[in-house]
């Protein structure tokens, strides 16, 4: 993604739980207390980009300012639900850019099992998305709830699959151009 990519900017603005390891003078504005200090052990949800920047000290060999935690969208409860049946999980309510957020977070954490769960989730949901996209009546009825729960990556996939199915029907002479 590029610097000016809106989806990338929105992904980086998603909140990530961070725990301060050191006392930081004058940074209380992050808690809504301007002019106050942030005490060591304070847990605050920060935008992903800021949390990553504040955690960089550990990589440079200095004391870590903050420790990053997994966001609620990737909690054990969500991962277990994805293992059970990924098609029933409303990813959009967890994070509008769920897969982009997952990719960014998994760059920071070593969670091999979660990678496998997310790959399996995408495969199963992509098959369901393709089914709804190729079946014009599939977006109605029981499929409407599923389609409302798609994250942005899945919505783009649905649009491309739907448009290509429509173009194929037009090419085959089964449908008219609008």
UniProtKB/Swiss-Prot annotation:
It is found in: Nucleus. Belongs to the GINS3/PSF3 family. Its main location: nucleus. One of its GO terms (cellular component) is CMG complex. Component of the GINS complex which is a heterotetramer of sld5, psf1, psf2 and psf3. Pfam families: PSF3_N (PF22466), Sld5 (PF05916). Gene3D superfamilies: 1.20.58.2050. The GINS complex plays an essential role in the initiation of DNA replication. CDD domains: GINS_A_psf3, GINS_B_Psf3. One of its GO terms (biological process) is double-strand break repair via break-induced replication. This is DNA replication complex GINS protein psf3. Disulfide bonds: none annotated. Keywords: DNA replication, Nucleus.
